[in-house]
């Protein structure tokens, strides 16, 4: 999992995106869930990490604002912009970069 010659899984996409601005995230989504400050989803800002599953272990995406997110659903499937899915989302989003 992560990034390979085929593409990204969800945690690989977030690691790649944040590395582009000099922030090194842990490899696994559950570890990324605890890598920043937790804020309620209603206070999400562009660039915050969204998570699904217990402790953020099942999936993650990057919040883009206006109810949209960018995600890699699995390796080999194109990265896409999607509406934010609230079902199964963790009670907090993770803010890694404070502005």
Identify what each model region corresponds to:
Residues 23, 34-39, 54-60, 64-99:
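Aromatic- and glycine-rich peptidoglycan recognition patches
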Residues 1-46:
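Catalytic cysteine-centered active-site loop
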Residues 49-51:
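Hydrophobic beta-strand signal
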